[in-house]
Structures are given as structure tokens and as C-alpha cells.
Amino acid sequence: MGPYLSQPNKNKTTTSGEGKSIIFAASEMQGWRNTMEDAHIHVCDLQQDLSIFGVFDGHGGKEVAQFVEKHFIEELQKNKNFKDQKFEDALRETFLKMDELLLTPEGQKEIIQIKGGDDEASYAGCTANVALFHKNVLYVANAGDSRSVLCRNNTNYDMSVDHKPDNYEEKSRIERAGGFVSDGRVNGNLNLSRALGDLEYKRDSKLRSNEQLIIALPDIKKVELNQTDKFLLMGCDGVFETLDHQDLLKFINQKLGNQQITPQLLGRVAEDLLDNLIAPDTSAGTGCDNMTTLIIYLKGK
């Protein structure tokens, strides 16, 4: 059996909500893929003036993405730097904490449960793209190739950069760790250079966590929001492979028009976006992945 269904599963799971300064919608669709391996988080007003959203695109199985979806916010809230409002350090440490938890006996047991009782070794991993809004500041932490794009002055302001093995710095680290890059893949296998999970690439005891073939360490971008910032678009790579960033923002803006922004409207727009991106067939290769998108609208901007 190949990676694709004979017909796409266009059923969507959509959630929307509203907080003090944010209206959001999240929608996910399995699409052409045999399985759904995406996960995401969305919490408005986790604390006063603080909201958090995230996309986790699984590979090699759904289990790591679902594990991170379950534990990320809980671990972030426990983090001392989070309590001290040192959000960049808190996000960085929480990304790394996910790998630590996966290595514990409890973590391994939970992975088996997510897999439906299959106790064979898991080779799964996931990307992580997490947006934290605090007052008028946005932090985006990224490991992998899920993305966040800010609609600023009606143009795209990219909040993350893909981590691909062909990137010079990433490739240099992979080679220092004893690996190689072939056809844009680490050791000819994984087409990401940073991810959560993928523990078989992180087992060299002589190397630190940020020196392994694959690392969970995120890049973090911080920006002060202003009156020209309208919304943040987040998504797994399947959302970004068909249209460029500017065209994606244009699609959303046209759908929003001059209507009053409500959670229900954003939910419909998110679903329309996925319907627009899915391929009519699998011949081209793009538009055939699982798709998850979040649209986070900034009130008063």
C-alpha cells in the first residue's frame, strides 16, 4: 500500500474561540494521506495577557505529535523561566523537555498506548512550531518545517525558517555528528534536521543534545506587534507547499473582506483554505499531505 488513499478524506476537525485580545480558528484535515499524523494546541488567555498556539506535524507515526500535544503546555507552565516571564528560555527548555520525557519509562509506555498497544520501537518524530503571545509581543519557536507567517501591513512577515538538512549550518552539524546528507535527507532518510522525537538520531552519548544528527533545539523569533499586524497564519508544511506566503495571506484577507471577525467566520475561512489547497489528485505530489492550519486574528490591530 502506498502513502495515499484512493480518494482524499476531506472531513475537517475545526475549533475556534475568542480571548481578550485574540480570535482564533484551527482546522485539520487528513487529505490524501493514509493516516493523520498532525496535532496542535490552542489556548487563549492561558494566563492574563498570554495565549499559546502550536502545530506539530508527525512523521513515522502519530505518537510523538500526540504526546507533545498532550504535554507541551503543562511542561511550559512548570518551567521556572516561564514563571519569571523569560519566555524565550522557557520555550527553548520546553522543546528539549519533550525529548527528555519521551526517554522516560513513563514516556515510552505512553507512546505504546498511543500506538494502540504496539510495543515495537517507535521511530516517530514531529515538527514543532509554537507561537506565544504576551501582551503586545509575539514569540515563535520553531524546530522543523512547520511555519508561522504574520500578516503585517498586508504583506508576509515570516516568523520562522525551515530546518532542512541541506542548510549549511545544519549540514555542518550533521557531518560533525558522523552523519551525511543525501538527496536532502539526514543519512538518506529524514528530510528534517530538527524535530522532537526521532530518538534514534540522538543516541550519541559523546555529544550534547544540540550536537546530535537531529536536534530539538528551536530557533526563536521575537517581534513587537503593532497596529499593522492583522493575523498570524500557522500551519504544517502541507499548508505552505502549494501557494506562496503572500498568496495565502491574500486568500485569507479576501475571505475575511470587511466582515465582522468572529470565531465562526475564522473557522469557515480556515476550512475554505484547506479545501483550496488540497490537490485534485496525487500526480503532482503537492497538496497531498495532512493539513493543519491556525489563523490567529489580533483584535484592535
From Swiss-Prot:
Transmembrane segments: none annotated. Its EC number is 3.1.3.16. The keyword Membrane applies. Binds 2 magnesium or manganese ions per subunit. This is Probable protein phosphatase 2C 4. Mn(2+) 2 binds at residues 57, 237, 289. CDD domains: PP2Cc. One of its GO terms (cellular component) is membrane. Residues 23-298 form the PPM-type phosphatase domain. It is found in: Membrane. GO terms for molecular function: metal ion binding; protein serine/threonine phosphatase activity. It comes from the Eukaryota. It is a peripheral membrane protein. Pfam families: PP2C (PF00481). SUPFAM superfamilies: PP2C-like (SSF81606). GO terms for biological process: signal transduction. Its main location: membrane. It comes from Paramecium tetraurelia. Belongs to the PP2C family. Mn(2+) 1 binds at residues 57-58. Residues 1-18 have a biased composition (Polar residues).
